[in-house]
Amino acid sequence: VFTLLQLVECLNKDNEALKKENQNLRDAINLLKGEQGKPTIPGKTKEKQGNVSSGEEIKKREVKGKRKSKAKKDKIKVDRTQICKVDKSILPEDAVFKGYEPIIVQEILITTDNVEYSREKYYSPSQKKTYLGELPIGVKGEFGPGTKTLVCTLKHSGNMSEPKIAEFLGNGGISISQSTISRILTNDESDFAKEKDDIFLAALASTPYHQVDDTTVKVNGETHYSQIFCNPFYTAFFTVPHKDRLTILDILLCGKERTYLFDSHAFDLLSEFNISQKIIGQIMQLKKEGGMSEEEMQEMLDTLYPKRKKGKNNKKRIMEAGAIAAYRQQTDIPLVDILLSDDAPQFKKLTEAQALCWIHDGRHYNRLNPIVPLNVKILNTFKTSYWDFYGDLLKYKTSPTPEKADILSAKFDRIFSTKTGYEDLDDRIEKTSKKKEALLLLLKHPELPLHNNAAELAARVEKRRQDVSLQTKSKQGTEAKDAFLTVVETAKKLGVNIYKYMADRISKKFNLPSLAELITQKFLLQTE
């Protein structure tokens, strides 16, 4: 009977696959006939796939600490005090003054402060030169630092579109065009791009691990990728045309020129990448001691593969092996020891170790959709064991010991060697068991998060931005977008008021410490 039930499950799975293939073929035929295929309706798709979120399971097993008090009144700045007097005519004769009962009412004023600067003007006939009085620092063009700060904050913190920003400012008495708003957002007069570079460089030294994720973006109609790096102190965004290992390495090099080194580690990688022993032998003969430049690397590849169209994938793997080895040996940029990510191939082999996200792995179990009641029960029972083990790992992080690590490692082996008889589930369990080293890396490094939610939430910020602004048009606009997103999201993590911070930078006052300095300060405080 059990075998028959599993056969029913397999037939249902095959039937669903055939339905999907049949619909794809129908869509292809319709397109050839000049008609449209079946529309993709997001709500219907999600309903059919089911909820793959594990939020409720995780919430049940979180280690709850003491809740921080959120006294609202303590955080409110009082700008002025006004006494509200009692009408003495209504008071009885025995009424006695007992002080004041305070009530804080928050208010905001939106008003213009348009200034006409009368610049003194002198002319020297002998020098044939005109001398003008200097404008205040931070004043450039026809809009002051306050207006520019508000434009940048509304766009990148409030996620408002440029037409709506123009409408809002117009209602407030500021006459400004959408093209001027666009120039303010893209010209980056305050050099927030440099600020982003400083943030990333400081952040690389702040923790041994970094989280990474990516999402698609559009640049002038072309598909690009936003690579997102983060840890508890920062979030940085990098829009790039590709999402391969070399691209990730270039980001980690912080603008430093990529070089190639073929040492023992590089040759180990070449073997893992299934490069033939013949090619490896040739590389040993052609490699240069002390590293190779990009030009020298391309010359070596031309020697290995004289026919340009041949060995395209092998060329890429050879470049990756040499670039990774060179990155590990360089000392100019802080090395990332551990990358926490999903299971995407471009994040593998780059660092000394890789940690994987438990929640991402758990989604695969939530996507299983058995129809046989027995298999439904088997799946639910296993998922309970899965998330109970996740809860054990959370508890381990609060008080790690070698003994507890050994117990959890053995428990992982027991859970993920289970044979349930439900074929799809057993296949999924086997795949998880092969990721043991990456999933249990926190047993050696308890500071590691169990999930990659921080990077995924940052990717969601990028997607919410696209809801308002579908794409950037130019390289300058793309770089400005990345810089502002990095500054805004990093300021949130550091508890910095982004409006005040942007105002400080745009006005050129520089009274506030940079975000890069704050990252270093917080890191040093944690290590004391």
Report the location of each language-model feature:
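Catalytic center-proximal scaffold of phosphoryl-transfer enzymes
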Residues: E9, K121-Y123, Y131-E528
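Short, flexible loop/hinge motifs at secondary-structure junctions
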Residues: V1-G141, S182, V212, E257-A321, ...
